[in-house]
Design a protein with these regions (language model features):
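Stable alpha-helical elements in mature extracytoplasmic
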Residues: 2, 6, 29, 110, ...
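Sec-exported extracytoplasmic/periplasmic mature domains
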Residues: 11-12, 22, 34, 194-198
Length: 203
C-alpha cells in the first residue's frame, strides 16, 4: 500500500522520485517504470484503438532475475489475437562487474538543472560497473553517460515523466566504494533534490 501511495503521488505531480544505483529494483522505482511502460504502450497505438484496447501485463514481479546477454529486451509489446500483451520492464541489465574499475562520466545536457555546477566530464576512481542495455522504458532525457575502459557504457543519469511527476535514476553507487563522498556525485543528488522538489511544489 505504501508503494502504491508513492506511485500515485508521483503520477499526480506532488512528489519527485530519485533512485540511486541498486534502487533499480526498489519497488517504487519498478512500479513507476511499469506505469511509464503502460503509458508508452498505449501512446504507440493508433488513437482510435486506445480507449478500447485490451491489455495483458506480464512480468509484474521482475526482482532478482538477471537476463542473459542477447535476450529480448523489455518492455515489449506483442498483439496476441485481440489482446495486446505487454511484458513489463525487467529494470536491470545483463552485465555488471564489482571490480572497482574507474568510470568516466560525461555531462550530455549541460544546460539542464540537474547538471548545474558540474563539469563536462569527471572520473569516479572506483565503482561497480553496470552495462547497457538497461531494461527500462526509453528515458525522456539522458543527462549523464558513464563509460569504462573495457568498453561498457551506461545511461547513468536518466529522467522520465511518469504521469505529472519526475523520476530520476543515477547509477553511481555501491557501498564498497566512497561514491557519495565525491563532490560531483553529491552535486548531482543535490541538484536533483532541489529541482524536483521545486517542480513538485510548483504544481
Amino acid at each position: 500500500a505504501r508503494v502504491e501511495a508513492v506511485v500515485k503521488r508521483v503520477q499526480a505531480g506532488k512528489l519527485g522520485f530519485i533512485a540511486l544505483h541498486s534502487a533499480h529494483w526498489a519497488k517504487p522505482f519498478v512500479r513507476l517504470m511499469q506505469e511509464r511502460a503502460k503509458a508508452d504502450a498505449v501512446a504507440a497505438l493508433p488513437e482510435a484503438e486506445r480507449a478500447t484496447a485490451q491489455w495483458q501485463y506480464l512480468n509484474e514481479k521482475p526482482y532478482r532475475v538477471i537476463p542473459k546477454k542477447g535476450a529480448p529486451a523489455t518492455p515489449h509489446v506483442q498483439k496476441v489475437g485481440t489482446v495486446w500483451r505487454l511484458t513489463l520492464p525487467q529494470c536491470v541489465f545483463p552485465v555488471y562487474r564489482a571490480d572497482g574499475a574507474p568510470s568516466h562520466v560525461a555531462t550530455l545536457q549541460p544546460t539542464h538543472p540537474l547538471a548545474a555546477g558540474l563539469p563536462a566530464k569527471w572520473d569516479i576512481p572506483q565503482t561497480e560497473m553496470y552495462g547497457e542495455p538497461f531494461w527500462v522504458p526509453a528515458p525522456d532525457s539522458v543527462i549523464f553517460e558513464e563509460k569504462w575502459d573495457k568498453g561498457e557504457h551506461f545511461r547513468s543519469g536518466a529522467l522520465w515523466k511518469v504521469g505529472q511527476g519526475d523520476v530520476f535514476y543515477f547509477r553511481p553507487g555501491h557501498e564498497t566504494y566512497p561514491i557519495y563522498r565525491q563532490a560531483e556525485n553529491l552535486k548531482v543528488i543535490e541538484n536533483a533534490v532541489r529541482w524536483m522538489g521545486a517542480e513538485a511544489a510548483r504544481r
